[in-house]
Protein backbone atom coordinates (compact mmCIF):
# COMPACT_ATOMS: atom_id res chain seq x y z
CA UNK A 1 0.00 0.00 0.00
CA UNK A 2 1.22 3.48 -0.82
CA UNK A 3 -0.18 6.82 0.27
CA UNK A 4 0.57 10.13 -1.42
CA UNK A 5 0.83 13.78 -0.47
CA UNK A 6 1.85 16.77 -2.56
CA UNK A 7 5.57 16.12 -1.97
CA UNK A 8 5.78 12.68 -0.39
CA UNK A 9 5.14 8.99 -0.89
CA UNK A 10 4.41 6.83 2.15
CA UNK A 11 5.38 3.28 1.24
CA UNK A 12 6.76 0.00 2.56
CA UNK A 13 10.43 -0.22 3.43
CA UNK A 14 12.82 -1.95 1.05
CA UNK A 15 16.36 -3.27 1.35
CA UNK A 16 17.51 -0.13 -0.48
CA UNK A 17 16.43 1.96 2.53
CA UNK A 18 18.86 0.29 4.94
CA UNK A 19 21.88 2.59 4.61
CA UNK A 20 19.81 5.77 4.85
CA UNK A 21 17.76 4.40 7.74
CA UNK A 22 20.94 3.71 9.72
CA UNK A 23 22.30 7.17 8.94
CA UNK A 24 19.09 8.99 9.89
CA UNK A 25 18.68 7.11 13.18
CA UNK A 26 22.31 7.46 14.25
CA UNK A 27 21.77 11.18 14.67
CA UNK A 28 21.46 11.91 18.41
CA UNK A 29 19.16 14.85 17.70
CA UNK A 30 16.69 12.40 16.14
CA UNK A 31 17.20 9.41 18.43
CA UNK A 32 16.82 11.34 21.67
CA UNK A 33 13.14 11.91 20.83
CA UNK A 34 12.35 8.31 19.87
CA UNK A 35 11.54 5.97 22.73
CA UNK A 36 11.39 2.62 20.97
CA UNK A 37 14.33 2.96 18.60
CA UNK A 38 17.75 1.82 19.85
CA UNK A 39 20.84 4.02 19.77
CA UNK A 40 23.29 3.52 18.29
CA UNK A 41 21.26 2.15 15.42
CA UNK A 42 23.12 -0.72 13.77
CA UNK A 43 22.82 -2.74 10.60
CA UNK A 44 21.32 -5.53 12.71
CA UNK A 45 18.57 -3.16 13.86
CA UNK A 46 17.92 -1.98 10.30
CA UNK A 47 17.77 -5.55 8.98
CA UNK A 48 15.23 -6.50 11.63
CA UNK A 49 13.15 -3.37 10.97
CA UNK A 50 13.06 -3.84 7.21
CA UNK A 51 12.45 -7.61 7.38
CA UNK A 52 10.02 -7.79 10.31
CA UNK A 53 9.29 -4.64 12.33
CA UNK A 54 7.97 -2.53 9.50
CA UNK A 55 5.76 -5.34 8.20
CA UNK A 56 3.02 -4.74 10.75
CA UNK A 57 -0.03 -2.90 9.50
CA UNK A 58 0.16 0.78 8.75
CA UNK A 59 3.90 1.43 9.08
CA UNK A 60 5.28 3.56 6.27
CA UNK A 61 8.65 4.78 5.07
CA UNK A 62 8.33 8.51 4.35
CA UNK A 63 10.00 9.35 1.04
CA UNK A 64 10.28 12.39 -1.21
CA UNK A 65 8.29 11.74 -4.37
CA UNK A 66 10.80 13.41 -6.72
CA UNK A 67 13.77 11.20 -5.84
CA UNK A 68 12.45 8.44 -3.52
CA UNK A 69 14.80 9.64 -0.75
CA UNK A 70 13.91 8.15 2.63
CA UNK A 71 13.40 10.97 5.14
CA UNK A 72 11.52 9.34 8.03
CA UNK A 73 8.80 7.02 9.28
CA UNK A 74 5.14 7.26 10.17
CA UNK A 75 2.69 4.75 11.58
CA UNK A 76 -0.83 4.56 12.87
CA UNK A 77 -2.14 1.70 14.97
CA UNK A 78 -5.57 0.11 14.51
CA UNK A 79 -6.52 1.84 17.80
CA UNK A 80 -5.56 5.26 16.46
CA UNK A 81 -2.15 6.03 17.96
CA UNK A 82 -0.03 7.93 15.47
CA UNK A 83 3.75 8.26 15.52
CA UNK A 84 6.27 9.93 13.27
CA UNK A 85 9.93 10.83 13.05
CA UNK A 86 11.72 12.82 10.37
CA UNK A 87 15.49 12.93 9.77
CA UNK A 88 17.13 16.14 10.99
CA UNK A 89 18.29 17.11 7.49
CA UNK A 90 14.58 17.46 6.61
CA UNK A 91 13.35 19.36 9.68
CA UNK A 92 11.59 22.73 9.38
CA UNK A 93 10.27 22.06 5.87
CA UNK A 94 6.71 21.08 6.78
CA UNK A 95 7.18 17.38 6.04
CA UNK A 96 5.92 16.21 9.45
CA UNK A 97 2.83 18.40 9.15
CA UNK A 98 2.16 16.99 5.67
CA UNK A 99 2.65 13.39 6.83
CA UNK A 100 0.37 13.73 9.86
CA UNK A 101 -2.29 15.37 7.69
CA UNK A 102 -2.23 12.40 5.32
CA UNK A 103 -2.27 9.87 8.14
CA UNK A 104 -5.25 11.45 9.86
CA UNK A 105 -7.14 11.29 6.55
CA UNK A 106 -6.13 7.63 6.20
CA UNK A 107 -7.15 6.93 9.80
CA UNK A 108 -10.58 8.50 9.53
CA UNK A 109 -11.47 7.52 5.95
CA UNK A 110 -9.80 4.14 5.47
CA UNK A 111 -9.54 2.74 8.99
CA UNK A 112 -12.87 4.29 10.06
CA UNK A 113 -11.39 5.54 13.33
CA UNK A 114 -13.39 8.00 15.41
CA UNK A 115 -10.35 9.25 17.33
CA UNK A 116 -6.65 9.59 16.54
CA UNK A 117 -4.16 10.35 19.29
CA UNK A 118 -0.47 10.97 19.83
CA UNK A 119 1.87 11.55 22.73
CA UNK A 120 5.15 13.41 22.84
CA UNK A 121 7.48 14.88 25.43
CA UNK A 122 6.88 18.21 27.09
CA UNK A 123 10.33 19.45 26.06
CA UNK A 124 9.85 18.46 22.40
CA UNK A 125 7.89 21.43 21.08
CA UNK A 126 8.05 20.70 17.33
CA UNK A 127 5.69 17.69 17.33
CA UNK A 128 3.24 19.57 19.52
CA UNK A 129 3.10 22.34 16.89
CA UNK A 130 2.68 19.75 14.12
CA UNK A 131 -0.24 18.14 15.95
CA UNK A 132 -1.88 21.50 16.69
CA UNK A 133 -1.54 22.56 13.02
CA UNK A 134 -3.41 19.37 12.17
CA UNK A 135 -6.29 20.16 14.52
CA UNK A 136 -5.25 17.99 17.48
CA UNK A 137 -5.94 19.26 21.00
CA UNK A 138 -3.87 18.65 24.09
CA UNK A 139 -6.21 16.68 26.33
CA UNK A 140 -4.08 15.45 29.23
CA UNK A 141 -0.59 15.16 30.60
CA UNK A 142 0.80 11.93 31.98
CA UNK A 143 4.04 11.36 33.84
CA UNK A 144 6.47 8.85 32.41
CA UNK A 145 9.77 7.45 33.62
CA UNK A 146 12.82 8.12 31.48
CA UNK A 147 14.99 5.00 31.31
CA UNK A 148 18.62 5.74 32.07
CA UNK A 149 17.90 9.28 33.23
CA UNK A 150 16.20 8.22 36.43
CA UNK A 151 13.46 10.78 36.65
CA UNK A 152 9.88 11.36 35.64
CA UNK A 153 8.88 13.71 32.85
CA UNK A 154 5.57 14.95 31.50
CA UNK A 155 4.12 13.33 28.40
CA UNK A 156 1.42 15.47 26.75
CA UNK A 157 -1.36 13.56 24.98
CA UNK A 158 -3.13 15.02 21.96
CA UNK A 159 -6.37 13.83 20.36
CA UNK A 160 -8.40 14.52 17.27
CA UNK A 161 -11.93 13.23 16.84
CA UNK A 162 -13.83 12.86 13.59
Where on the chain are the PLM-derived regions?
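Conserved GNAT-fold acetyl-CoA-binding loop/helix
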Residues: 29-50
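Short loop/turn motifs at secondary-structure junctions and domain boundaries
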Residues: 51-56
